[in-house]
């Protein structure tokens, strides 16, 4: 009996150890899955630096999106004057984006990811130190202040084509949607920081006796913080290693008697039709966004009297919720197909503008804006990834820049008209016009691209050998 009891106790101990091991294994497995979802094995050191730089630069864009419209309104800018400023910013950003996109395919991408944030830092210091109109217009244009305003204002400015091309070159096609989802997540994280903690920082410091809470002092202090974040974004990109794309050799000089032709940008026969269709859809989208995109903060300020300390936290809450969309973007595309997923996202963006501008209270309008941003933040990385996937690697920087050029140029046309409508007609009308144009853009995008699949979807549909 003693021997049997000992054996029973040993068996019970063994079973307990086995059960503990089995219960520990799922926990370890869940931890590994969670870790892999956040930082998969295919990510690299350079991706980490670029994502960190994206967080910092996105934070500055989000903070500027809250500060600039309200600050300029407080120092006397009308809706029409704001529209003129945003038009100048859109034109300069379009020119810079096109130039950087083309040059990045030839000179390399890293230099622009370092220098452009430092231009934003200089612009922030100018806003902090002077009200002189020509300086404000000039440096707003150089720093791209006035683009990407609103919750989740995580754009990073004119260097985005260079950044997209550098990141797209670093992964296999099957991982590209996931990588761009993480880029969008980093943008949302930066926007969360910029529109949340950084907008309330002056008030927090004021509780400790610092003189940064009266008059325009909170705005000027925040511009100095913005400059510091922009400097840090450029510094973080310095350690990134870049492999230059291999291009076809330069053609030999023409032989005697042949007519010399000025060299110009050449894209492959496969890429040109894609670019033309992107130009058409992005032109309409640029017109739409120009009517309301730069004015989101200004509209909340005019419609509900909400200042930066109220609008900023609202944007932070919206951005926090929208971050989930970034990480689900790849699954959404795998379920519907990337073109259908982008189409659904754009349709929702157009529809949800209308109840937002008709909402009687600030927080109800904020709730509709939240729903719209959930759709927008899911569609944005998919569109960027899709464009990078359907063009040749050596043309990605050029296409990323050139495809957005009509959008940025068109978005320079509508802000001035929107500003006039804000001042003289109705606050809701520019938003309603923008919603109609976005609906047209949605139909155009689906018609133009429904038959053009990215490589990862084409590979899945090929029959096994």
Kindly give the residue locations of the regions a language model identified.
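Structural signature of the two symmetry-related core transmembrane helices
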Residues: 111-126, 340-355, 435
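Hydrophobic core of transmembrane alpha-helices in multi-pass small-molecule transporters
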Residues: 55, 123, 133-159, 166, ...
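Transmembrane alpha-helix termini and helix-breaking/packing motifs in multi-pass membrane transporters
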Residues: 69-70, 74, 191-217, 298, ...
């Amino acid at each position: 009996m003693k021997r049997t009891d000992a054996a029973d106790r040993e068996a019970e101990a063994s079973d307990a150890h086995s059960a503990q091991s089995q219960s520990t294994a799922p926990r370890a497995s869940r931890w590994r899955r969670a870790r892999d979802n956040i930082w998969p094995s295919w990510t690299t050191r350079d991706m980490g630096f670029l994502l960190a730089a994206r967080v910092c630069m996105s934070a500055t864009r989000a903070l500027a999106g809250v500060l600039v419209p309200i600050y300029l309104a407080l120092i006397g800018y009308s809706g029409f004057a704001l529209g003129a400023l945003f038009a100048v910013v859109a034109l300069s950003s379009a020119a810079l984006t096109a130039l950087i996109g083309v040059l990045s395919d030839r000179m390399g991408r890293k230099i622009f990811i370092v220098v452009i944030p430092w231009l934003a830092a200089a612009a922030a210091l100018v806003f902090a130190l002077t009200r002189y109109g020509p300086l404000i217009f000039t440096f707003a244009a150089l720093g791209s202040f006035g683009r990407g305003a609103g919750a989740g204002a995580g754009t990073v400015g004119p260097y985005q084509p260079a950044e997209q091309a550098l990141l797209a070159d670093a992964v296999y096609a099957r991982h590209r949607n996931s990588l761009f989802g993480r880029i969008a997540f980093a943008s949302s994280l930066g926007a969360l920081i910029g529109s949340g903690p950084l907008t309330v920082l002056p008030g927090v410091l004021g509780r400790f006796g610092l003189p940064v809470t009266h008059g325009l002092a909170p705005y000027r202090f925040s511009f100095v913080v913005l400059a510091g974040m922009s400097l840090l974004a450029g510094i973080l990109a310095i350690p990134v290693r870049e492999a230059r794309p291999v291009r076809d050799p330069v053609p030999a000089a023409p032989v005697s008697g042949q007519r010399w032709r000025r060299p110009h940008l050449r894209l492959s026969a496969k890429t040109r039709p894609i670019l033309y269709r992107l130009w058409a859809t992005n032109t309409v989208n640029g017109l739409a966004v120009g009517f309301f995109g730069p004015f989101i903060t200004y509209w909340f300020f005019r419609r509900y009297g909400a200042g930066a300390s109220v609008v900023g936290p609202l944007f932070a809450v919206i951005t926090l919720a929208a971050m989930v969309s970034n990480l689900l973007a790849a699954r959404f595309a795998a379920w519907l197909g990337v073109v259908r997923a982008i189409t659904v996202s754009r349709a929702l963006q157009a529809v949800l503008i209308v109840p937002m501008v008709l909402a009687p209270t600030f927080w109800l309008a904020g709730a509709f804006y939240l729903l719209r941003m959930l759709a927008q933040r899911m569609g944005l990385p998919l569109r960027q990834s899709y464009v990078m996937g359907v063009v040749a690697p050596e043309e990605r920087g050029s296409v990323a820049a050139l495809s957005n050029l009509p959008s940025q140029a068109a978005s320079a046309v509508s802000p001035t008209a929107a500003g006039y409508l804000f001042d003289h007609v109705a606050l809701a009308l520019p938003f309603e016009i923008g919603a109609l144009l976005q609906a047209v853009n949605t139909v155009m995008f689906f018609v133009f691209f429904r038959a053009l699949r990215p490589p990862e979807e084409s590979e899945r549909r090929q029959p096994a050998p």
